[in-house]
């Protein structure tokens, strides 16, 4: 609606009003009614234009009423277990076991918790799930012999479903590139091997960490040779 149309409507409304003789009081009343009518028409026209062109509109909700669309994603990232009841184990090597790698849990900084067992030098998994499996060994030698030295470290699994020993993680290292010359000083060497990975395990699975040359193990310091699992 244009401005000329609004003015014409106001003039028609003034002509339609009955003319009264009463002096200034009647004129003021007519002026008030005319102004009031003009404001109503102008306000309605402005509101229509704003709604029509989308300047204003119905308020939209900033947040969805139903948060169930978000909750599954948040729940997916959380574990059904609390940190206090997750199976965990950390065993250390027995420094007094000559010629073999024997794991112990009754030592400082060693533990078995929430169902994990140490049986026949193997860790027994108490429940199905994802587990972090890790182990470290440290080899030490003096000089290099004429024969090539190969050091291996392997983590194996015997699953309850097929009862076959399968290597999960394995590494091979050779600390000596050449033989120590005759008459030369035999210098010491150190060779650490660390293994770690995440695997899906079943209840009752047995895990072992083994080496091929226990005679080269270094037990000089605690915390150098260990084996463990952590439920995720």
Curated annotation (Swiss-Prot):
Chief localisation class: membrane
Cystine pairings recorded for this chain: 144-176
Transmembrane residue ranges: 35-57
Superkingdom of this protein's organism: Eukaryota
Gene3D superfamilies associated with the record: 2.60.120.40
Chain residues carrying a lipid of type N6-myristoyl lysine: 19-20
GO cellular component: extracellular space; plasma membrane
Glycosylation sites noted in the Swiss-Prot or TrEMBL record: 79
Residues on Extracellular side: 58-232
Changes after translation: The soluble form derives from the membrane form by proteolytic processing. The membrane-bound form is further proteolytically processed by SPPL2A or SPPL2B through regulated intramembrane proteolysis producing TNF intracellular domains (ICD1 and ICD2) released in the cytosol and TNF C-domain 1 and C-domain 2 secreted into the extracellular space. The membrane form, but not the soluble form, is phosphorylated on serine residues. Dephosphorylation of the membrane form occurs by binding to soluble TNFRSF1A/TNFR1.
Keywords from the UniProt entry: Cell membrane, Cytokine, Disulfide bond, Glycoprotein, Lipoprotein, Membrane, Myristate, Phosphoprotein, Secreted, Signal-anchor, Transmembrane, Transmembrane helix
Biological-process GO terms, alphabetical: extrinsic apoptotic signaling pathway via death domain receptors; immune response; necroptotic signaling pathway; negative regulation of protein-containing complex disassembly; positive regulation of apoptotic process; positive regulation of canonical NF-kappaB signal transduction; positive regulation of extrinsic apoptotic signaling pathway; positive regulation of JUN kinase activity
Family as reported in the entry's similarity comment: Belongs to the tumor necrosis factor family.
Subunit-structure text: Homotrimer. Interacts with SPPL2B.
Main function: Cytokine that binds to TNFRSF1A/TNFR1 and TNFRSF1B/TNFBR. It is mainly secreted by macrophages and can induce cell death of certain tumor cell lines. It is potent pyrogen causing fever by direct action or by stimulation of interleukin-1 secretion and is implicated in the induction of cachexia, Under certain conditions it can stimulate cell proliferation and induce cell differentiation. Induces insulin resistance in adipocytes via inhibition of insulin-induced IRS1 tyrosine phosphorylation and insulin-induced glucose uptake. The TNF intracellular domain (ICD) form induces IL12 production in dendritic cells.
Official protein name in the record: Tumor necrosis factor
Species of origin: Pan troglodytes
